[in-house]
């Protein structure tokens, strides 16, 4: 996702405050939950993104629905600020920017593993261990099914691509056979 500069600024400020209080991972989880909640309820999203609704009403709604309900004061204050500035539309970008900044500080590299079929938990663990060993970095992988793959996996992590798909093996075999035939 493309993240605006303003979203990066909000995320950086929120991370700085959250780190001071030692709640940076909690804040990350809260941001993700809020983004998911907004995506799941279009009427709530439309309410907060509607410029015709005054910021006072939005602030009151934020405080009434989140204050004292397990959401950190830092996240509530950020949402209040977004309501004041009529910038609720960048909440998802702030969440992504926050995650990226947190990953950078914790030395985490994210990646995606695509496979034709769902991978068993032990296969996922094995893949993570092998990629961690090769890159010598802490990694977090997400797994996706790709019906275009005949079999095997394709992992893209931190600018690296590990392609162990049947498609690639067949291409290499074809190239080798053509090379030997000539």
From Swiss-Prot:
Pfam family, one: OSCP
Keywords: ATP synthesis, Cell inner membrane, Cell membrane, CF(1), Hydrogen ion transport, Ion transport, Membrane, Transport
Main localization category: membrane
Membrane topology classification: Peripheral membrane protein
Keyword Transport carried by entry: yes
InterPro entries in alphabetical order: ATP_synth_OSCP/delta_N_sf (IPR026015), ATPase_OSCP/dsu (IPR000711)
Subcellular compartments: Cell inner membrane
Signal peptide: none
NCBIfam families cross-referenced by the UniProt entry: ATP_synt_delta (TIGR01145)
Family the entry assigns: Belongs to the ATPase delta chain family.
Quaternary structure and interacting proteins, as annotated: F-type ATPases have 2 components, F(1) - the catalytic core - and F(0) - the membrane proton channel. F(1) has five subunits: alpha(3), beta(3), gamma(1), delta(1), epsilon(1). F(0) has three main subunits: a(1), b(2) and c(10-14). The alpha and beta chains form an alternating ring which encloses part of the gamma chain. F(1) is attached to F(0) by a central stalk formed by the gamma and epsilon chains, while a peripheral stalk is formed by the delta and b chains.
Purpose: F(1)F(0) ATP synthase produces ATP from ADP in the presence of a proton or sodium gradient. F-type ATPases consist of two structural domains, F(1) containing the extramembraneous catalytic core and F(0) containing the membrane proton channel, linked together by a central stalk and a peripheral stalk. During catalysis, ATP synthesis in the catalytic domain of F(1) is coupled via a rotary mechanism of the central stalk subunits to proton translocation.
Record-given protein name: ATP synthase subunit delta
Gene: atpH
